[in-house]
Structure formats: C-alpha cells, structure tokens
C-alpha cells in the first residue's frame, strides 16, 4: 500500500465536503443532522480551526485526518478504500506527532470502536450524546504513548 500525507489547503475544501457527504449518506444509523451546505461549512471550519491532512494513494485522495492539537476531530476514509490500512496509517502518522490522542466515537459505530481499540485506544467515558450534534450516545477514547 502506497500512502502519502499532504497538508490540506483551501483547494481541498470541496474534496473534504464530498467525503463528509458520502460518509453521511453511507451511515444510515446516523441521522442526517446536517444538510450538504452545513457539511460544506464544517469542512471549511475544519480547514480553519484544525490541522487537516489529506491521505493519498497512487490514484489520489482516499480520505483525511483532522487534528485539533492532540484531539482527532475527524478521520474519514472513502468507503471504497476502507479496510486497506489507510486509517491505521493515519493514526500512526498522528501518534508520531503526539504522546496522547483523544477522540469521540458514536456507540452505534462498532467498526470504529474495534478499530481504535485495536490501535490501543482506551475508553475514558461514555455519554448519552446530549453534547453532540446528532444527539447519539458516544464514547470518549484516549491513546497514550508507552
């Protein structure tokens, strides 16, 4: 697997918005709390307030990682590229930058829970989702370098 990490620029906003839109459409258990314009706004917010890294393979963009210091605000891999190690490579990329990483995962997203636990993340707390946009129960994870 060939993977490159390239710092995102304003020109990546459309690609980020499309990845977010595709994610929202493919996750049927998660209600569409945001319309396409709101997801585009969120993509722009990520570019302005976090460090966004585009994940590339030999044919182009396969996803992105958004970090706000040591907090993972988003790791999105296009559906056709999931299961090929791009997400794991992105986490390893982030782990090389920080001694601790934190993130929230929806409790309904069993695949993501298994993914992060396999990479050494530990559950810190569970919530009823009152504080997230989707109002879905979620889990707060933390990884610490050993």
Regions found by a protein language model. Give the residues of each.
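Conserved donor-binding loop and adjoining core beta-sheet/short helix segment
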Residues: 62-73
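Conserved acetyl-CoA pyrophosphate-binding loop and the N-cap/start of the following alpha-helix
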Residues: 80-81, 85-93
């Amino acid at each position: 697997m060939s993977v490159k990490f390239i710092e995102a620029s304003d020109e990546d906003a459309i690609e980020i918005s499309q990845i977010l839109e595709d994610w929202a459409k493919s996750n049927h258990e998660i209600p569409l709390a945001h319309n396409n314009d709101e997801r585009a706004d969120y993509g722009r917010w990520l570019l302005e307030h976090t460090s966004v890294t585009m994940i590339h393979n030999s044919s182009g963009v396969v996803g992105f990682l958004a970090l706000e210091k040591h907090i993972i605000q988003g790791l999105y891999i296009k559906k056709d590229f999931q299961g090929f190690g791009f997400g794991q490579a992105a986490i390893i990329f982030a782990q090389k930058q920080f001694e601790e990483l934190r993130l929230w995962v929806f409790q309904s997203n069993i695949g993501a829970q298994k993914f992060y636990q396999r990479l050494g993340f530990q559950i810190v707390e569970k919530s009823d989702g009152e504080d997230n946009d989707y109002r879905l129960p979620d889990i707060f994870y933390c990884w610490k370098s050993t």
